[in-house]
Design a protein with these regions (language model features):
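Extracellular beta-strand/beta-solenoid scaffold signature
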Residues: 51-56, 78-87, 103-110, 125-132, ...
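Sec-dependent, cleavable N-terminal signal peptides
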Residues: 1-16
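Parallel beta-helix/beta-solenoid
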Residues: 37, 59-62, 67, 81, ...
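Right-handed parallel beta-helix/beta-spiral solenoid domain characteristic of secreted/periplasmic
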Residues: 20-28, 39-52, 63-106, 278
Length: 278
């Protein structure tokens, strides 16, 4: 089986050894499904060329995936991939940490996943979304999301980090969200939808490149209430778009810096001071 119980004798890089004694079991090949609660760990790089489904499916509540800085790879499926790197739906308390995930349609895809935590991951070369999390009480922090885009022509938008529901998004770095294919594709560094009282703070987004009449958006909130957008830095080179966008005067913007957008911070945001647009 791909997911194996923890064993005493293992061969691993030194940097990962400290965490292995806490592992419920190991993920040694993919695709695989996790059906037992606990902490499931990688101890080597794994990859797959499947074009649909998921490399790792979380099928129960209270699961942690700890990759120990190893890679989950999906580049073999090509740019038309329909695969998620890690997937869960209607599962509580999922945690994804210390993973390097590349080459999927969506790197981390958690739907209706209340209390999910996504932290300390590196995602790159995913074609549609790097991280996508819906659910309330979620936390997305200290992730690096690079080189999102290059999907099939049918894609109409690309997001590095997408959320739906009340969430906290903090201390993430997003770089190179680029609409390489398609027509009039909009790109988003942080796309925050729905939820009440979401917090988006101390994030960085740079080099967001739409195509055609599509727009570039550093932080884009919609259909939500009372979002707090604080201390973020977003930058592009002369983009048609908005650095920070709030929905229907339902967001507070404070101490943010935007650079290179046609509109730095739109009028839907309450300007609570310290914001600068260049």
């Amino acid at each position: 089986m791909a997911a194996l119980p923890a064993q005493l004798a293992i061969s691993t890089p030194a940097h990962a050894v400290e965490t292995f004694h806490t592992c419920t079991g190991f993920i040694d090949s993919i695709p695989t499904t996790i059906s037992t609660q606990g902490t499931w760990c990688l101890r080597n790089n794994v990859s797959t060329s499947i074009t649909s489904g998921a490399a790792i499916t979380i099928a129960t509540n209270n699961v942690t995936i700890d990759c120990n800085d190893f890679k989950i790879g999906g580049l073999g499926a090509g740019v038309n991939t329909n695969t998620s790197g890690i997937y869960a739906s209607y599962k509580l308390n999922a945690t994804i940490r210390n993973c390097s995930i590349r080459g999927f349609r969506t790197g981390i895809n958690l739907g209706s996943a209340d209390a999910a935590v996504v932290q300390d991951n590196r995602l790159d070369q995913n074609t549609y979304r790097g991280i996508s999390v819906s659910g309330n009480g979620t936390l997305i922090q200290r992730n690096q999301v690079n080189d999102t885009g290059a999907g099939p022509a049918a894609i109409t938008e690309v997001s590095a980090i997408y959320t739906s529901g009340s969430t906290t998004v903090e201390d993430n770095i997003v770089q190179n969200v680029i609409a390489s294919n398609g027509t009039n594709v909009s790109v988003y560094g942080f796309q925050i939808t729905s939820g009440v009282g979401s917090s988006v703070s101390r994030n960085i987004a740079r080099n967001l490149v739409a195509n055609g009449t599509g727009g570039s958006y550093g932080i884009y909130t919609s259909n939500g209430l009372k979002a707090f957008i604080t201390g973020n830095r977003v930058a592009v080179t002369n983009a048609n778009g908005i650095g920070i966008r709030c929905n229907a005067s339902n967001g507070s913007a404070k101490d943010n810096i935007t650079w290179g957008f046609s509109t730095g911070i739109d009028s839907g945001c309450y300007n609570d001071g310290g914001n600068t647009s260049h």
